[in-house]
C-alpha cells in the first residue's frame, strides 16, 4: 500500500501483522503522516517488526506519493502465537520492536550500529582515523552482535538465519560486510541480498542497515 504526502496513511497494524517495511523517498519523514497517532494507540504487543528504507523512486509505480508500506501478516485464526522479543537492543525509531516471533519464525527489525542514545556508535564514526580499518565492518560487527542476541532471546541462533536484507549507502562496502558474515557463520551459506539505497539512512552517519529473519527449531 502507499500514501501521498499529506494524506492519512491507510496502515492496518492489527494483531496479525508480523512485519512492516516503509519505503520512503523523503528521508525527512520517519513515519507517514498520521502514523504517530495510530502507533501511539496501538497495544504494545501488537506492533510488528519495522524497517524504514530510503529509496530514490517507487520502482515501476508512477505516482506522487513519498511512502510505500509493505505488511506481512498471519492469517486470521492462525495458531502461530505472536510475541515481542526483547534482548535489550537499542532501537532507532519510536515504537519499533526489536523483533517479533510468530510460530517458528522470528522477524528482526532493521538494525543499525547505534548506541543507547540512538546515535551511531563512536567506533564507526571517528573522523580522526578515517582509514583505520573499515567503518562498514565495524558497523556490521555491532549489528550482527545484536542480531545474534535477538536470535538467542527468541530461542535460536545465527545458524538458523533464513533471510538477510542488507542496505548500503555505498555498495563498495558490500564485500567488507560480507566478510564479517563469512567469519561469523564459518563460511556457511547465507540467504543474502544487498541493495544500494540513497543516503542518508535514518541514523546520521550510518552506512549499513541489516534486516533478518530466522527459523526457531
Predicted features, each with a name:
Residues 1, 14-16, 23-145, 149-162, ...:
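N-terminal presequence-like segments and the immediate start of the first folded domain
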